[in-house]
Design a protein with these regions (language model features):
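Compact, glycine-rich, soluble single-domain proteins
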Residues: 43-182
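N-terminal secretory signal peptides that target proteins for export/translocation
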Residues: 1-20
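Intrinsically disordered/low-complexity terminal segments and short unstructured peptides
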Residues: 6, 30, 62-64
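Bacterial N-terminal signal peptides
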Residues: 25-37
């Protein structure tokens, strides 16, 4: 239709309706633009790096078998729910003899997964006395498969994938913690 008298409809009696409709279209376009930009900017959070909580760093000892001397490891301690939930997510490199120690208030069956974890990990589950309950070798990065303790565990030690085999960790392995960490 030709635009007459500055109105889309061409009739003076529709002026107010046309102006109102154009105003609503402008508001609609602004809303669509904002809603289209915000999700692209915010994302769904799945691929975004979550700020890591602060972790205490301690030295622990692991006796791979009763016949061997203890081996020292430098570990970050995850003892709060937030720390345990974050764990080693988004870590792209873990130096040799470094890891994370998950500390729980009491023994219970434990499940871990590798969500947002970029490196393979060995998971060693220990009871309150530091005895090995179960060991998972080289858990696959990013896997949502649940890794079970297969018994009650109070501590879980995560190391680089392959380190448990490298240091010949056996079923009689013991975790030795500093007194303040127990």
């Amino acid at each position: 239709m030709w635009r007459l008298s500055g109105n889309w409809c061409g009739a003076n009696w529709l002026c107010r309706r046309c102006d109102a409709a154009l105003g609503l279209w402008r508001v609609f376009i602004v809303i669509v633009c904002v809603l289209g930009v915000v999700p692209a900017w915010a994302g769904d959070g799945a691929d975004q790096t979550v700020s890591a909580p602060d972790f205490a760093v301690i030295e622990i000892k692991l006796t791979p078998t009763h016949q061997r001397a203890p081996i020292s490891f430098t570990v970050k301690v995850a003892e709060t729910e937030r720390q345990r939930r974050h764990g080693l997510m988004f870590v792209s490199h873990l130096p040799e003899r470094h890891g994370m120690l998950f500390v729980f208030e009491s023994e219970a069956p434990r499940q871990f997964w590798m969500k947002n974890t970029q490196i393979p990990l060995d998971m060693l589950f220990f009871d309150s006395a530091g005895r090995l309950v179960n060991m998972i070798h080289a858990a696959v990065p990013f896997s949502l498969t649940r890794r079970n303790s297969n018994g009650s565990a109070r501590y879980v030690l995560e190391l680089n994938g392959g380190e448990a085999a490298k240091f010949d960790v056996q079923s009689d392995a013991r975790l030795l913690l500093p007194l303040a960490s127990q």
